[in-house]
């Protein structure tokens, strides 16, 4: 499955989120490919779901895939709690 992680510039925050999401997926037996991008590049990207900070996620309304909003980017438990249900739905083919 493929995730797109999004931040304002497409470097720091989105790359950190991508590594966290991939590690969480691996921990639960899922292979997650991904791309870290800036907000402008995210719109219309081909993926199964997106992950972004709460502020950025609100800018992604209207995307055809689910956008997971993370409030505390340093809270790995929050990331796992919010991302795992989406990973499991995508793995089952449920959108």
Model-derived segments and their meaning:
Residues 2-41:
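Conserved active-site segments centered on acidic
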Residues 34, 47-53:
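Short, hydrophobic beta-strand segments that form beta-sheet elements in well-ordered domains
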Residues 37-41, 46, 78:
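Short acidic active-site motifs
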Residues 38-39, 52-58:
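Short, polar loop motifs at secondary-structure junctions
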Residues 42-46, 57-66:
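Short loop/helix-cap segments at secondary-structure boundaries that form the rim of catalytic
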């Amino acid at each position: 499955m493929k995730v797109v992680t999004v931040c304002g510039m497409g470097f720091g925050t989105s790359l950190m989120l991508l590594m966290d999401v991939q590690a969480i997926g691996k921990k639960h037996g899922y292979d997650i490919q991904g791309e870290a991008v800036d907000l402008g590049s995210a719109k219309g990207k081909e993926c199964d779901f997106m992950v972004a900070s709460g502020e950025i996620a609100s800018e992604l309304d209207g995307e055809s895939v689910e956008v997971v909003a993370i409030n505390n980017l340093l809270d790995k438990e929050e990331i796992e709690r919010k991302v795992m249900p989406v990973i499991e739905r995508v793995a089952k083919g449920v959108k």
